[in-house]
Each structure stands twice: as structure tokens, then as C-alpha cells.
Amino acid sequence: RSSLLRRFQLFFVMTSFLRAVLPQTLCARFESWRKNGASTPSLLVNGLLLTLLLVIFPLEREPFGTLRSRLRDYYPQINPECPRLLDSLRIIIQSFWLLFVKPGRPSGAEAVEKVLAGLRAAGRIINRVGELWGNFCLSIIRRVKPLSEASNAGDSGEVNDRTQFSFGEKTLIVIAVILGLILAAICITQPFNLQGQVVFLTFMFFSMIALARIRARISLMLLFVISIVVSGRYLWWRCTSTVNSDTALDLFFSCALLLAELYAFAVMVLGYFQVCWVLDRKPYPLPANRKVWPTVDIFIPTYNESLDVIKPTVYAALNLDWPADKLRVYLLDDGSRDAFKAFADEVGAGYIKREEHNHAKAGNINHAMTVTDGEFIVIFDCDHVPSCDFLLSTMGWLVKDPKIALVQTPHHFYSPDPFEKNMHLDRRLPIENSLFHDFIQKGNDTWNATMFCGSSAVMRRAALNEVGGIAVETVTEDAHTSLKLNRRGWSSAFIDRAVASGLSTETLSAHIGQRIRWARGMIQIFRLDNPLFGRGLTLPQRLCFFNAMLHFLHGLPRLIFLVAPLPYMFADIYIIYATAASIFAYVIPHMVHSAVTNQMLQRGYRYPFLSGVYETILSWYILIPTTVALIAPHVGKFNVTAKGGTIDKKYLDWDISKPYLVLIALNLIGLAIGFGKAFFSPNPEFLTLIINLGWIVYNLMILGASMAVAVEEVQTHAFPRVPLSVPVEVEADGVIHQAELVEYSQVEVRIKNLDEALTRLSEGQAVRLHLSDGEHRFTFTAAASVFETKGIRDFTMRFADKTEERNFNRCTFARRGMWATTPDPTIDDRFLTGFVQLWNIAVYGYRSMIEFLPGKTLPALRDGIISFLPKTPSAYKTEA
């Protein structure tokens, strides 16, 4: 009883002290919190924290008054009128995000601006040094003209073919390569102590910074050399000094990571070789006499696609600019559908079907070859729509050089792919396949190893007949066919001009299904017709084809990288047996140099950090098919990629996300264990923990972005809309109004700059649209739709017949230059910007995971977890 009395007296004294010391406004604040529903634990915790803050800071005075008034602006998660128990943690997370992540900032940060100005000045000095060094290097080798910046392929706009060197230039290049390899071997194997390694890498780092600012072949090739040397030293160190063999388990994990790193190094070096001298080939002009132009057969294979999907392609093929007596369009229907035959007959296309449906698409094309006789064959997937200048852009090289068997053009898509759509990427950013179709193929062309991609290509019939038609031994018949053609001595070419565009896969699951087939097929080729062996190929051709196949074995290495830090967290296994200082001295430079060099190489074709997301999404799903193909290459069948669909509501594809969820759970557990070791271990290894925790955080960012891609966005339009800016005349009630067409699909157009008379049109009211394809003027009937806002209105097309529909296709889909695009130079593709973008995508992915958690009992859990995630303050929004 006396103990209870003493406690009551102590409580009374403390209460009296607080009432005497603390201002009346604080007591009123406590009372306000209580009336607004704050819980007792929240009152105790937040009251104690507020009391401590008042003791340290005079919060009731200026300038803290301004901070108090804007608390909700910068911390949207916090309600000052009704605090929650863990608001302090929310403030810490949001503060960290505002200080170190959020790129924007309120005005008035003069000190920060001064620091940034100093950094920019230092950067300009480094850039100037780099320019002087680069000019000095260029002057040394100025006699080898193709190495200079001015001779970079395609800069002059002239027609380009593979570079031809004189004997002296070849000799100089061979000597330089041999000396370079010897020097690289010495640099890679030369033993340094830790201080020597730091000095060497410092020199390499500043060399990289200087060279990265010079746009010339020589600077890029020197960056390749520096990257290979730095990464080579890292791997030499890994192989000779860091393999942990204390126990069998240690050896297993250590060797697993080392093998994954060796794979990544091999892909990196082969990639550098593949694109070290890209050829920007332009179309070659055709003979002026159109009578000598060759005959061309257009093949459009189809199996189970809808008629609406193939219509634009057939119309565009019929609209190709080519002599009518030398052009024949064929619809190859492996589905044997009467509606398709009737459509082909009505529009004037040929219709071919076969009794036996062997070997899928390859068999379909090979059968069509037996009943046609054109000198050249053009193959379009049924959703790939060519512009009318497709043949004018591609046939010139085939007519000029009788040894060219294949001319391939890049694959572009007019509907957003799952990455672009689900990650809400800017449409100006390069899409997932841009790196290969817009850049690597130009490198392949340099080495006469252009790969047939199954569509948007022209092939010489004589060459196809020589190799037995389209290859049927694997499920990637296109790449295998180009390999066979090169083995027989035929050449290939890649035209760097988008003259066709197709439909992307609508969902992530469809995309993964397509890539599984590609991965299986490429490994089948590796096993059945390995490019490293056999006759007919040059060494560069072998390396280019081998690298294409090696790429699809990234499944296991990528998974290893995603779990590599966990053995240390779970069982104190050192997968890199070295001190933390040595790891910093070797690992970080290896990562920085390879990342910067690849970014310099891929600028305009791949956004920073997204390669890891692309590979992570596919890694689990291609692992088993590629492994099976290595063991049993004849197993597997051709699957048709579904195209042309809608998505009624937004959802998270939990089934496709299961591998990512497992990896997220493992990394989160590892993260928790790591923090536990840091705070509660008697002798924590802080540097080692920092390295592994940083690795885990990066893995979680990649996995969070992967989850974002699995969130399927609504797609209400059955016919994708395509942007196009051309003038249009709208005739209503006998009056012609000038306007601008800004978007179209197969059945609709969107028109802006409408005057008041057109905005008042009733729904369904008929108008006449006058459009030009650049040469001819066409008139179409359309009906006003319900959508109208700010001088913009949709109109539904009402085609009188197939001829009118074909003419509309010529004015839109098949319009000359319709698909031609160039990388946007205004895109900010710096590493910091890319990292922030990756962070934002990952946050969106984790938010979506919580949002789409199944069940009705979890809303509170979702809201609670979401409240801890950082948010953009309203202060930033209003100032923007």
C-alpha cells in the first residue's frame, strides 16, 4: 500500500510539474487529440515526443511556426489533429525520401543550388579535359578514317555498306588489337596491394569520365577496353583470392555466384564486340526503269487471329508502292476459315490454305512457296502493318547485290507493351525491344550476321530454296533460317528505318509466353546447329549468333544475383571471401564501369536500370524451358502469341507473380536479419552488412518494379489508337471546317482544333472527312461520337465498302513514313534520374501488392502499410 501511495504521489508531482512548465497550448493540444479520437497509446507516445521537442526546441516561436503550418504539406501521411501511434516512424521515412530521393524541391534552397553549381563547374572541367584527351587520341589515329567521329556510319546521310579497309589499315588494326590484348592481359593479371588497386582504379575512373563525353568510335572503343580491364581484374581477383572453400556449402554458394559473374562477363564482352562498329545502313535507290523491278510475293501467315487483326496488314500490303503487275499479296490461312477466304477475294488478295498443318508458321510459309513464284518473298506477321514505302526502302539492296538473301527492318509496335503500359513509362522512352531491333541489329549487319526476325523482312526465293525453305527443326524458325543462309555463303542486311509496325502483347503473361518460345528456340539452335562449330561462318558471325543464344540463358544467373546476399544473412556464409575494403575496391568499380559503358553504348535504346527488370521478370519462366532444351532439344512446340484484346478492369496477376513474391519474401527476411545483426549482434561487421543490405535493397527495388509490371491496366479500346498529326477537313451541313487529326484507329479518329459549330454536333450526326495520303485526296463518312472536350472530338468511321476502308488505311496506317521514329534527345537518361524512376516504379509495385491483397478483412492492414510509404508533398505539386 505504501508503494502504491509513493507512485501516486510521484505521478501527482510530475503532473503538477508538467502543468507548470508546459504552455497551456500543449495541454489544449492533448485535449484536442483526445476529442478527435486518438488512442491512449498514441496520446502517451506522441505526448512524450512533443514534450521532449518542446524542451529542446522553442516550437511555439518563429521560424518553427512556419514549419508547423506546413507540416501537412510535406507530410501528407500525418494528421496533426489526430496523431497515430507510429507517426514518428512515418515522419522519419518521409524525411529520408524528401532529402535523398525526391528530385524536385521547393524554391529558396540557395545553399543546395550553390553546391550543385560547384559540382556542375567541376563536371565542366572534367568534360573539357576529356575533350582534349579525346581530340589528342583522334589526331594520333587520324589516318584510319573510319575511327574518327566524322566518319561515324550514317552521319552523312549517304547510302552505307560495310566498311572496306585498305591493307595498311587492316594491318594497323590487327597490330593494335594484338597489342591491346597483351596490354589488357598484363593489366588484368598484375598483382596490386589494396593501395595500388585504388590508385589504378582512380586513374581508370577519371579516364572513363573523360571519354564518356566524347562522341566518337575511338572513345567508345577505349571505354570498352577500360570496362573489360576493370571487370577482368575483378574476376581474376575473384577466381584467385575470394573462393570460400571452408565447407562444402560455402564452396557451393561461392562458386554459384562466381559462375553467374563469369556468365555476365562473357555476355558483356561479346556484346561489346557485337556493337563496337555499328553499320547505319540506309536504303539503296532502285533503278529508274520500273520495268526491271523484280516480282514480289507478300506472305501474311495467320492461324487463329481474328479478322479485325489482319485487316490493316492486308490493306497496307495492297497499298504498297510497287508496280501492280509485279506485286501479289497472299493471305496464308492455317485456320482454313471461310470468312478469311471471302475477305481475301473481296479485296483482291490471294488466299492459300493447306490440308496438313505441320511445322506451324514455317510449314505454312514453305507450303505457300510451292504454289507461288515471285523472285522475292516479303513476310509480315498478320498484325504487322507496313507503310507504303516498305518495298522502296528495302528492295534496293537486293537488286544491287545478288548475294544478299535477307533484308530485315526493325520491329516497332503501335500499341504499348506490358512494360510501357503497366509501369506508366513515358511513350518517348525506348521500349523493351528497342535495344535489339534498333541497335544490336546494326552491329550484326557490320559482321554480316543480321538475324531474320520472322516478320517485316524481304527474302530472296533462290536463297530460301537453297536451304530448303524456312527452318522447321526449332520453334524459332526465323533465327535458324538466317543462320542457315549465312552458312551457305549468303549475305544479309539490316535497314535502319522503321517501315512497319505491329501489335504488342496485351498482358504480361502473353509476353512471357512469347519469350519462353524464343528462349527455347534459341537454345534448340544452340544444341542442334551450334554456330561455334560447322562450316560456312566467319568468326564474327559465330560470335554474334552465339551471343544471341547465350543471352537466353540469363535465367539462372539472374536468380543467383537476386538471392546472393542471403547466405550471409541467414548462415554467415561469405560468398566473396575477402575483407569489406577489398570488396569495395574491386566490386564497386567493376559495377560502375560496366554500367556507365553500357549506358553510353545503349543511350537512346535502353533506359537505365530497366534491363534488370526485364531479365528478372523472365528469369524464372525461361529457366526450365532452356534447361530442357539443352538436354532434349527436340522437345517443345510452336505457340501462337495472342494479339488484339481488351482488359476490362485493373488487376494484379497473382499467378504470374508467384516467383517474384517468393523472392521478395526471402529478401525482406534477409533485410530484417541484417538490421537485427547491425543493432543486436555483439560484434557486427558493419561494412559487410552495409554491402549486403545495399544489395538486398537494390534487389527489392528490382522485384518491386517487377510487381508493377504484373499490375494489368485497363485497356478499353479493342482497336489501339495511333498518334498522327495531319490536317483534315471536316464537312458538316455543307460547310467545310479546317482541323487537325491527332489520333486514329481502325474505326475511329480523334480531331482537334474544332470550331464552335463542330463542337455542337449531336451524337451520331454524319459528317464528311477529307484526308490526304500526301499525294491523293480521299473523302470518308463519319459520325460524331459522344466524346467532346476543349475543341477535341471523336468520330466513328462509316465505310461504304472495302475500297473506302483500304483508302483510309493508306491515309493512316500505310502512310509514307508513318512508323519512322528517332530517339528523343530531350529524354533525361542520367543514372540518378533512372534510379529515381526505378524507385518510384518499385514503390508503385509494392503499393499495388497491398491494394490488391485478396479478401475483405485486410483494408486496415493495406491502409496502415501504405501510410508508411513516402508521398509527394502538396508543396511540390503547387510549386510545379
Language model features by range: what are they?
Residues 315-326:
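Short, acidic, metal-binding catalytic loop of nucleotide-sugar glycosyltransferases
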Residues 333-340, 356-357:
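A conserved acidic beta->alpha catalytic loop
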Residues 295-297, 328, 480:
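Cell-envelope/extracellular polymer assembly enzymes that use nucleotide-activated donors
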Residues 3-292, 344, 554-558, 681-684, ...:
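N-terminal membrane-anchoring/stem segments of glycan-assembly enzymes
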Residues 3-14, 650-657, 664-880:
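Structured alpha-helical
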Residues 274-278, 352-376, 387-475, 486-487, ...:
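Long helical/loop segments within the catalytic core of UDP-sugar-dependent glycosyltransferases
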Residues 381-385:
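The conserved acidic donor/metal-binding loop of glycosyltransferases
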Residues 484-500:
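Catalytic donor-sugar/metal-binding loop of nucleotide-sugar-dependent glycosyltransferases
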